[in-house]
Each structure stands twice: as structure tokens, then as C-alpha cells.
Amino acid sequence: MDSVPRLNSVLTLVLSGLWHLGLTATNYNCDDPLSNFLSLKAFSSSSDITGSSSSAQLNWRMGTGGWSPADSNAQQWLQIDLQNRVEITAVATQGRYGSSDWVTSYRLMFSDTGHNWQPYNQEDSIWTFVGNMNSDSVVHHKLLHSVRARFVRFVPLEWNPNGKIGMRVEAYGCSYRSDVADFDGRSSLLYRFNQKTMSTLKDVISLKFKSMQGDGVLFHGEGQRGDHITLELQKGRLALYLNLDDSKARLSSTVPLVILGSLLDDQHWHSVLLERVGKQANFTVDMNTQHFRTKGDTDSLDIDYELSFGGIPVPSKPGTFLKKNFHGCIENLYYNGVNIIDLAKRRKHQIYSGNVTFSCSEPQIVPITFINSRSSYLMLPGTPQIDGLSVSFQFRTWNEDGLLLSTELSEGSGTLLLILEGGTLRLLIKKVARHGTEILTGSGLNDGLWHSVSINARRNRVTLTLDNDAASPAPDTSRIQIYSGKSYYFGGCPDNLTDSQCLNPIKAFQGCMRLIFIDNQPKDLISVQQGSLGSFSDLHIDLCSIKDRCLPNYCEHGGHCDQTWTTFYCNCSGTGYTGATCHDSIYEQSCEVYRHRGHTAGFFYVDSDGSGPLGPLQVYCNITEDKIWMTVQHNNTELTRVQGSSPENPYSMTLNYGGSMEQLEALIDGSEYCEQEVIYHCRRSRLLNTPDGAPFTWWIGRSTERHPYWGGAVPGVQQCGCGLEESCLDSRHFCNCDADIDEWANDTGLFSFKDHLPVTQIIIMDTNRTNSEAAWRIGPLRCYGDRHFWNAVSFSTEASYLHFPTFHTEFSADISFFFKTTALSGVFLENLGIKDFFRLEMSSPSEVTFAIDVGNGPIELLVQSPYPLNDNQWHYIRAETNLKETSLQVDNLPQSMREASEGGHFRLQLNSQLFVGGTSSRQKGFLGCIRSLLLNGHKVDLEERAKVTSGVRPGCPGHCSSYGSNCHNGGKCVEKHTGYSCDCTNSPYEGPFCRKEISALFDSGTSVTYMFQEPYPVTKNTSLSSSAIYTDLAPFKETIMLSFMTTQAPTLLLYLNFSSQNFLAILLSRNGSLQVRYRLSKDESHVFNMDTENLANRRVHQVKISRDGPELSIQMDQQLFSYSFSPEVEFRTLRSLVLGKVTETLDLDPEVARANTLGFVGCLSSVQYNHIAPLKAALRHASIAPVTVQKTLTESSCGSMVDSDVNAVTTVHSLSDSFGKTDDHEPLQNAVRSDSAVIGGVIAVVTFITFCVIGIMTRFLYQHKQSHRTNQMKKEYPENLDNSFRNEIDLQNTATECKREYFI
């Protein structure tokens, strides 16, 4: 029995190799001329100048010296009957001898019957061959894929413009032998095994088939335990069912495992190969292969008794079949090395043949193709004035709309129209004076399948029948008297007819028709081609040139393909990609890029390889810190208790990050730094068993390798962090837990070796002893930095360049990068092939060109910029080419785009090195910087290559010149090697771009006083620019900005104290309008009243005061007021700035004192005096800034939302925060998953809420007392203080505090 699998294995390999050899053509000696011994009758043509057939064999010089048609037009052809099916591997052509007649380009077509021709395809399109340039030279073409056919036809496309069509031709190849079986749709072939069950671990099944219909079973086998294999043609596609030993998966209830192919009912030969080894399998239909894994529980396929071909016969019921039988021919059918058809022909006992013959019967069906949606039509005559009408035909198309039939009826019966509209069949009979009749049937008829249509009118009854089979709906009928017309127009109408003769309310039909019957008589379409019947325009007769443009599916990343007759479209919805072929990711490649685009913290999708094969992964971007952290969560970030594990019964947990390992690796490799926090709490549970024992705990990273080191240690040493620091509980061990004590200990640290991250699995084996227990937690993956986005190089000479391996791509190619330069021109990138190439260059200071040739001739796209591109600023370029279009984008300028040519080459075939910053000729080199180069999503490391290349330097300074405007509100751009950062020291804002407001909530007694003196060190390195602020304390210019929100008036917003008791006060007067008061001397005050609405209206308002010498401007929201001081006015030295209530004993102006009495109740934000931000200093640098805060100052989110975004305040909790705070050794029990955790959590929450309520009541009572104090002043001041506003803010703020997150 062991010899059987071995023999099957050998046969599998041998047969697989022979099948592939036959598929690619090519016996080395298969290049003989095939027409040497043919008679003159073997050559035929559409027409001939002699009126009869002429020999057109290569090198023929007699007679007319070759073939030339009577008229030189696109309808001419020359064909050879090779008498038998042969293998054709090459063709050759000449012009007509001794003439100026030759063909410069042509197409090849093949057929087994002389009808239903098939064009020669290459690169998934109809191939055009280059012809001759004179009448004598021979142009030879080796076919990339050999063809097996009896007839070969040459179709001239272009010819010598100074002559006519003229050809002498030859086909090369060899004889072809095959075994063929013909199935009539009611028969099958059975291959019976020598034993009851055939069990195979490997299978190879190969065949070729030609089908007359779209459905039918090609082969089937099944076993009693649920094994089955079935190959079935379903609507012109091959469906494979394959299951190994699964009794639940019956054939009747399963869906196909794989579906391949399309339009396989075209009556042409198609090849099939199924290769299986265990559960791994390859399924190939024609040239398309799909790899898949089979269903089932075992690796063997167990088939009982027999395999059936052509149908699934029902046991004990002869002539009965489970599914529709195959109707067509099968050739060279092999099952694991056994030639099934040969056994049947020799009538071997293993084969049972039922009504199967061994030659392929070919029906003489002549299809036609309507190729033009404007001008294609076919006119066929009918018998006029018959009482009734009968028309039937079959059609197939991809278009939703098109005219199928139009005919003018006799006796004033009107016009009959049959239209395909929105994929539905619509029959209209239009009457001139009366109401017409309409019948609708079918849907989705633009599915590319053959559909039959029949229109019958008899005895005042018209019937429309679609696809006359059991699944069709009942025909729709309507009573009407009609008489047949004399002409029937199919597909469209000629331009020279009136509407009554042929009416087309919709575009012409594009698709195929066949089997046209009028008055129950078939129409000979070959006679139409020869001009003896009817007329036509823009038709291909004797072939159906329908093509499935969605096979293969060129829509990338799971995009859905839809098509019409001429093109395909990609529906990218839900894929995360966009573009003509769903090639371009809609997501950024890192959190760093999101930050650069101006986004704030939050969840984002990151697509690390852009347009590459990896999909997007959801991460959290913490963009509120200097380092932009990217966090990827997994499925188990809580503390987990482990007991009862041992080497014999280990505990294991696998972590799932919501993405593939390839996605995670790309994210990690593209980051500057990554880490994961790991925590291991232990009691009598050893971790690594140091120093010499086998580890009891280990973890697995991105590969399957075990890692016996713990957080804080480095790879290669079996230690924990305390071992490296020599701080372990027991100096004899390198981990705290390895001390194996009966108390809680822990080993906590970080994994940061990127090549090992992320942690994917943890195994624990020492918690099975008495009092032995462990609790572990592995934090999320956290990374920062983008190694690519700021990866830049500088080219210093025109002869310098970087070279990289060839840019390999198939159907889509995209290139993107940033550049900056001061040069007038230069080549960015160039890659060459034998014919194909692409080149991106700045051709002038304001123009970028993208030149490319994919084999159809070079094209050049140009983008012209209205501004110079050599301004030493960063500019962005993106170029893309795909099957649909070629495009070029520069910055945000309008895109330059050109649609791809239909039916041409589309593969970009390159073989030279990729040159960056120059060309292979070392001319027109680029001077400047290039960064962030991406090729189809692949990140090119420019800096690494520049380190070993002369004339090119890694890095490129000067980012702030381009991106300094991203630093808002007075923020200063700071250059970094990898990009830039915004220094918000002198801005009242903060955040990555100085756009986050700093706001505070003021009570009636709150006072913030800023003293003007030497600057405080807000950073480690005090900047000179900061100290320069204070050199002139009586500035000639000053700018004051703030935002406020209040319901109180009068109230004091800001008080600026000068020396000699002078001041500047900004306040709201009694009516809520803005007032600015200057006192510049004892006797001189300046009061500026702004005629505004009541600003104490619980809305945010902005104030900006600018003074340049004596000129003063005050902007209140959108209103601008201008004033002037006298030139003699002198401004004193600054002493202090007060926000809220002025508490110093100062000689206040009475109006200011009145506004100051109750202080300020409300919100202040974004307060700035020149380059000083007093509110920011109070909230962020209170310990080192010259600022004093009295009473309660609460940071709040109630600041202005007018000119800046409100960034979400994000708190990042360390995964170890809830440990060690109460007990340095034992983990908090409520952090471990247990019932006690729930109880403790509830108690803690209730307790905390109680404290919150007490806090709210205390604050309320305090405010009530404060309001009681002010009752004595009610006579002097108006009762317009809105305490409800204060209370609302307090309650909201206290409630917010109660919502803080605690780990309990």
C-alpha cells in the first residue's frame, strides 16, 4: 500500500510539469512552416483583386505575387485552412511581390471551425502585430503563447498610405494530437476504481474544455464520510467544491471554495489545472491561478467507487442526474496521471461511457459584435404586411442601456422597439394617434451572459419571452393589432433614416448577438458579411469580442470591479483606499504625519506602507506631547492572575492587536523607538529561574522565537531589569521573582528592542505549588518618531545622484516625495527599460514634467505653477500610472491627468537602476534636497545611501522656512534634524502647534499678579530672545490680547500698573460695553468707550489692543476702533499686570475701583501682553515665574473657540500606576480579575461620589456666605451680578472632577 502514494507523488510531479510545458507551447522543434504542402484552396480571403483565390504563401512570386483585396478597408482579411488542429508558435508576413502594397500592422485570429473566431491576446488585450515597411522583407513574430487551431486569419489594420493592402503570409508550428470526448448535455463518463475507496494525499487533475452553454458539471466524486470534489460551470464561471473528511459539509449545502474564470461559454477552448497537496491547493483556469486551503479535518481525499465526468448520475436511476450536465467537449482529461478519455476510447473496463462520442461536434453558430455605441447597426429584411410578427435572437453585453431592435410596422401599426434600459428588457409599440403598449421583464441583463429573447404577435396578442426556461418569469402579454414590417434594425439606426423607419430613443447597443430568426427563419450572417443580405455598419461578423475587464480584478485592496463594454470602474467604498483602481490610501503613514497635517490627539488609522499591500491599522495618536506617541492596544491589557500552571500544564495567553504581524512589523520598523511595559507580580512563582536554570516564564515576539529576558533587560541575557541594575531582592538571582519568597514581589520594566516587538504570547509554568501565584500584565505597544517622513538628502553637484534597485511594478505605480531647490531645473528620478521608462523632472522654475512610456509610446504630463518652485521651500510631488490613467500632482495645484489608451500595453517594464537626483547620463542633475521618497508605498532610505555616496549629504536643514507658519499664536519654529518643533514659550497657547488655549476660571476674589522683572527659566536652556523682552520695560509698542466670558458688569478684566501710580485698565462698564482707561499722569486720564453690545452675555469675546507710539487701535471681536494720544504723552515703566481682582493698596480710579469691588467672575483665556503670557505662567510655571495667585484659580476648558481648535486633554496612564502605591510588594486585589474586584470597585465608587457631593455642598454654602457679605453694597452697586453663572461653572467643574478615572 505504501507504493501507491509514492507512485501518485511521482505521477503528480511528472504530469504537472508536462501540463505546464504544453500550456506554454513548446516543443523546441515546433517551428516548421505549416503551409508548405497546402493547396491553393487552403488560402481564402474576404475579396481578391483577381476575383478568385490567389496563393499568398510567403516568398510567392507568381501571378499577382500575393494577396491584395478588391478594396483596401478595415473589413478585409486573409486566412489559411491548415486542414487539422495544429500547434501554431509563430507567424511571418511580406508585402505583395513587386508592388507598393504591404500591411504595416495587423491582428491574428484563430478558429477550429472557420467560424466564431477568437483574436490573439497578449497582456490581457487584443494584440497588434507590427507588419512590413516594404514588399520584400520578412517580418517574423514568435508568439508568446502558442495557439492550437485549424484556421488562422490575418486582419490588416494599417497599410502603406501610398499603396494598398498586400500580404504574403506563413504560420509556423507542428502537429497536435489530443484525446477528445463530446458530451451532448445528457451523457456522462464514469471512471471506476479498482478498490472501493480511492484515498489520495496529492491530486493533479487537468483538462481542456469547450462549452456550448453556461452551466454544467465537468467532474464529480464523493465519499461516505463527507469527502467530495466537484468542478461545475456556473453562469460561465468555474466553481470548485472540495472538502476533506467533513461529514457536515454536504455538496448540496456548501458554497464553492473557489470561483475562477468568466465567459467560459464562448465555445472556445479553456484549460483547467487542479493541484493539491494535503490541504494546500492551486486552481488554474487559463492563465489565472488561485492558491487556497481546503476545508475538512484530514489531508487525504477519500472518493468511493468512481469519478464521474460530464454530470452527476443518480445511483440506480439510469439517465437521471443531480445537476445540469455539461454540454460541450473535453480534451486531454487526466486524473492523477490516468488518461481518462484514452481509456474510454479503448473501452477499458474501468470506464463506463454513456452516449459519449470521441470527436468534437461544432455547431456552425455565427455571432456578431456591435462595437460602436453611436454608429453600429444591422439591418435584416423581413416579410411585410403579415398579420403577426415573430423575431427571436440571443444577446450578451455589459452595458445597462442600448437599442436591441427597431422596426416600422405595416398598416399603420406603429413602431416596435425593444430596448435594454437599466439592465431591464423593455418592449414598446408606439402608435401615432393612439396610446402605445409597454412590456417590461428581467433585471441585471447586462451580466455578460447569453440571454434569449423572443417576440411573437398572433391574433391580436403580443408576447415577450426572456430566457425560455423553468426559471424565467411568466411572459407578459398585451392585446394589440400589429402587422410585420419590411426592415428590422438590430443594435442601432443608420444616420440617413427618418424616425418612422428606425427609432432609437437610447444609445446604440454594444455587445454580441447570434441565432437571429425573423418569421421563424434563421438569418445567414455570413451572407450579410459578403454583402448579399441586408446591410450593416461597425460590426465584427463571425466573432463575439466580449471581454471580461474585471478578470483579473485590477481593483486593488478589495475594491469591487464594475464594467461596461469599453472599460471598467472600481468601487472603493469601505476599503480605506481611493483612486481609479483603489490604489491610494486615504490614511496617513504615521502619527507624525497626522501631526504635521494639523490633527490633534485621537484614534486614527495608520497605513504604514501607503499604497502597498498592507491594510490600515487603528492606533491612538497622542499628539499633545513633544514626542508623538502611537499606541496599539491588544486584547488583554488588564492584570491577569495565574494559578495552577506547571511545565506539564503551562499557562499561555496569545495577544491580538487587531492587525496582521506584517502590519505591526511595518509600524515598528518605521518608528524611531518602540516599547511595551511588562509587569510580573509573583509569590512563590519564579520568572526566569536565574542564574542557571531553565526559565519558567518566557514570551514570544514577532517571530516564533522564545525570549527568556524580562522588561528592563537586554536581549541575549537571561535577566530582569533589577539584574542589570544589581538591585534584585536576592543578589544570587537576576530577577526579584526568582528569589522564590512567600511574599509578593514584582519585576516590571520595558521591552524596547524593536526586532523582538510586539509581544504576541506569554507562557507561565510555575504557579502550581502551595501558595504559588502570579499576576501579569503586558501594556500596549507604544512607538514614537517616523524614520521616513523627514528622511532627506542634499545634492550638491549636478553630477551627483543616488542609485537604487530597479523599480519593479506591474499594473500600478505611484511615486511621491518632497523637494526644495534654488536651481532652475533638474531631474528628480529616472528609471529606464529596453523601451519603457519614466522620468520626473523640474523642467523650469515653474514647471514639473512626468514623462513615461509603458510600450504605447511616450507621453508627458506637465504641471505649471503660478509661483516659482525654486524658492527654497518644500514642495510636494506625486506621480501615478495605472490601467485607467496617468496623473501628476504638485502641491495643491490642479492635477494633470491623461486617460490610458484602450487595449494597449499597461505593464511598466524597467531594467536599469533607479536614479534619484540625476540620470544615467549624469546630465541635468538636481541641485537641492529630496525627502520622504515613496515608491508604491515602499519607503526609500535616502539618508543611508547618501552616507556612502559622494556629492550627496544626509539630511537637509531649513524646515522652518517652509513649515514655520504651522506654529501659530506667536509660537517660534525650531529646527530639528528630523523636522521641526514649535516653541510656545512666548505664546499664551500651548500644544504641538501652539494652538491649544490656556484658560482659567476666576472666582470673585481670584487675583493673578505678574511682576515685570528678569525672565523666568521656562525651559532648560533660557533663550536670548526671551530675555530680550524685558530690556525695555516702558515699550514704545505694546500689544494686549485676551478672551473672556462672563455675566458680570461692571467688572475688571485686566489692570496694568505703571510707575508713578499710572495704569491701564480694561473693564466692562455698567451696561456691559467695553471700556479702556489710561492714566498717564496725575492730572490726565484717557477713557475710550466702545459702543458695543452688552458683553456680559455668557459668550466668548476677544479683545486686542495695539499701540504704536501715540497711535492706539482697539479691536473688540470684529469691531475695530482707532484713537490717538497727543505726541507729548509719556508712557511709564511697567511694574505689574493683574488679572481678576486688584488686591494691592493702590490709588485706583473710582470707576476702576467700582469694577474691581466684586472682582471678576468668569473665564479668561489666551491672555498676552507683548511676549508675556501671565495666565500661562500662573498655570504652568507658578513656582519659577514672577507671578502670584490669590484665592482659587481653576484651569478650565471654557476658553475661546474662535481662532483655535480646542485640543482634547489626554491623560496617559502607566500600566503600573495602580501598583506599589499602597503596598510595594502585593498587587492590589481589586486589580485582579475576581469577584472581590467588583465588590471593592463598587464600594470605592460610592465612597468617592459621597465625597464629591460633600465638596459640592461645601462650595455652595461658601458662595452663599460670600453673597451675603455683598448685601451691604447693594445700594451702591446695581443688582446685575449673575450668581447663577458662577454656580453653573462650579457645578460643572466639580462634576468634571468627579468623573476622573481611577484604577480600583
Curated annotation (Swiss-Prot):
Glycosylated residue positions: 282, 496, 622, 1057
Domain Laminin G-like, first and last residues per copy: 180-360, 367-544, 791-956, 1020-1198
Bilayer-crossing regions: 1237-1257
Gene Ontology biological process terms, A to Z: cell adhesion; proteolysis
Disulfide bonds: 329-360, 512-544, 550-561, 555-570, 572-582, 929-956, 960-973, 967-982, 984-994, 1163-1198
Record-annotated Fibrinogen C-terminal domain positions: 584-790
InterPro entries (alphabetical): Aspartic_peptidase_AS, ConA-like_dom_sf, EGF-like_dom, FA58C, Fibrinogen-like_C, Fibrinogen_a/b/g_C_dom, Galactose-bd-like_sf, Laminin_G
All ranges on the Extracellular side of the membrane: 25-1236
Domain called F5/8 type C: residue spans: 25-174
Record topology, Cytoplasmic segments: 1258-1304
Membrane topology: Single-pass type I membrane protein
Name of the featured protein: Contactin-associated protein like 5-1
